[in-house]
Amino acid sequence: MTAALVDSLRRPGRLITVELRPPRSGLSAAEGMDSWIDLNHSIRHLAIKDIFVFLTDDAVGSREEENLGHLAANVGSDVPLSRLVPFLTCKHTIEHCLLYADRAHSLGFEALTVVGGDVSTGPPRCVPHSYMLRQRIRERQPGLSLGGWANPHRDSSKQVEYIGSDDFSAEFYLTQIVSHHS
């Protein structure tokens, strides 16, 4: 069985997705709660309109709140988890990453985007390249559709080579057209 996201990507026509970031960690309890409430409203509004929502995980090196726990606990039963696609970076221990994927699958998420994470900041990656983590996750959770990322700041022909490789281990990939890092 493929994820709703993968099925939608294969269909002709337009597909709109949105990437959101959880609140940064270190906020006061009140600020954190307000941020999560605002984010939750956005997620619910988009997902109910059949828009896929990707929620990042420390992708740019800023400490963020853990996304999976929030999504599972707070979005509500009227929001299909098939429309929500959490990110997982390699910037955690391998044990955390594998358990995260197990949790995602057991909670009912159909897809997970696994990316390396910014090597210039924050904790080190548990594996050198995200495809290695996707391979490990695939062994444990073969029913979870996995995605990757093509880096728009690297050589484009090399990025295409990576995503076209059999060991990329992903059913979908993302990239950025415009970046706030540029």
Stretch-by-stretch model annotation:
Residues M1-R21, S25, A30:
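N-terminal amphipathic alpha-helix/helix-capping segment at the start of soluble metabolic enzymes
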Residues P22-E31, A47-G69, G116-C126, S182:
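Glycine-rich, proline-tolerant flexible connector loops at the mouths of alpha/beta enzymes
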Residues E31-I37, T89-R103:
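Glycine-rich anion/phosphate-binding loops
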Residues G61-P86, V127-W149:
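Alpha-helix-loop-beta-strand connector modules within alpha/beta enzyme cores
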Residues I94-H105, K158-F168, S182:
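Catalytic cores of alpha/beta
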Residues G117-L174:
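Internal, glycine-rich beta/alpha segment that forms the wall or movable "lid"
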